[in-house]
Design a protein with these regions (language model features):
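N-terminal secretory signal peptides that target proteins for export/translocation
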Residues: 1-5
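Bacterial N-terminal signal peptides
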Residues: 8-19
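Flexible, solvent-exposed loop/hinge segments and secondary-structure transition points
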Residues: 23-165
Length: 165
């Protein structure tokens, strides 16, 4: 009888522990970049850069840093494909522009080792997409001047500003 009492006690303890963790379980709700939002951002960024005669590539990533949309301008150089993606990934990962991140991770910074992470790049042109303080994605532009890349990326995000409120 002592053994079955211990077994019953153990079953009750395990069941109680499982029921409390089950009651704490929730569906996780997250905001993310929709396909239409990503397309709008990318198309706007390309159009903005074309006004200055620049042929660029644009990458938009979601909250997990996964590529959501990629557009390559008609005469954009092939290396800009990778650069646009890395700029977007950098802005998403660190929740700030790739230029701000580059400034924070200079050679004399205690954060300099972050530059060794795969897929990041210390070049201007990556801009986070935010809802309040939450980063839900990012856009990267490559093929203009570095300041031009960032301005075109910002124009893309500005186009969807009302949807980000």
């Amino acid at each position: 009888m002592g053994g079955s009492y211990r077994t019953l006690s153990l079953v009750i303890v395990v069941a109680a522990a499982m029921s409390s963790s089950a009651s704490d379980a929730q569906v996780l709700m997250q905001r993310d970049v929709s396909l239409h939002m990503a397309l709008t951002i990318a198309e706007t960024a390309i159009a903005e850069c074309e006004k200055s005669g620049n042929n660029v590539s644009v990458a938009v990533v979601d909250r997990a840093g996964r590529l959501r949309v990629f557009l390559q301008g008609d005469k954009a150089a092939p290396h800009n494909i990778e650069l646009a993606q890395r700029k977007a990934y950098t802005a998403r990962t660190f929740g700030r522009t790739s230029a701000e991140w580059a400034a924070r991770t200079g050679p004399d910074s205690e954060l300099a080792a972050q530059r060794q992470l795969e897929h990041v790049i210390a070049l201007r042109g990556g801009v986070p997409i935010k809802v309040g303080g939450e980063t839900i994605g990012a856009v990267g532009v490559s093929g203009s001047t570095s300041g031009g890349d960032e301005a075109c990326a910002m124009a893309g995000v500005a186009k969807v500003a009302d949807e980000l409120k």
